[in-house]
Amino acid sequence: MKVVSLRRIYSSEIYKLPTTRLHMDTLYYYYFVSHLAAALFVDLPITEWLGGSLSCLSGLRRFYLSTYEDPILLIPAPWKTALFSSELFFQVPFFIWVSLRLRKKARDPVLWVAILIYGVHAFTTTWCCMFELFAEKKWMIMSFYFPYLAIPLWMAIDMGGRLVKSCHAAKSGPSSTITSKSD
């Protein structure tokens, strides 16, 4: 059985990230940074959880809710609580980690798998929210949510493509990166 060290492939000249991928990574970086801000200042009621001690941070959230009356944030439901807890405990730490990695222009398959997982997760959860907004005819709010639907979908497709391409590169790479291993 042939085993390929993917880390050696990425650190070698076999796999070079095309310029368009670097531009996409820059877009993803800004997406994650902006989504971190949106999560902390709009989506999550952090100031309410802290007892209103940071009321200056809740101004944007109050403005958004009073202006647009977003039913996803205003009307409680158990499934929404699950999504918000996911955002707090999974997405917020992930946004910080992935932003730092993308800023360093990391070419790491672990990063790509993580972004792929995030993309699928964010797309499916936002898809559910979009259906509720559609049912309530909240077109303006749907336009706010749309980038959080489209960009994660594109991320998932892009990262899946990168992983497939890297597997093909690893499979057809030089024999110096392939070692034989008996079963």
From Swiss-Prot:
Domain EXPERA: start-end pairs: 24-156
GO biological process, any: protein targeting to mitochondrion
Source domain of life: Eukaryota
Protein keywords: Endoplasmic reticulum, Membrane, Transmembrane, Transmembrane helix
Coiled coil: none
Transmembrane parts of this sequence: 26-46, 82-102, 111-131, 139-159
Family to which this protein belongs: Belongs to the TMEM97/sigma-2 receptor family.
Protein name (Swiss-Prot/TrEMBL): Efficient mitochondria targeting-associated protein 19
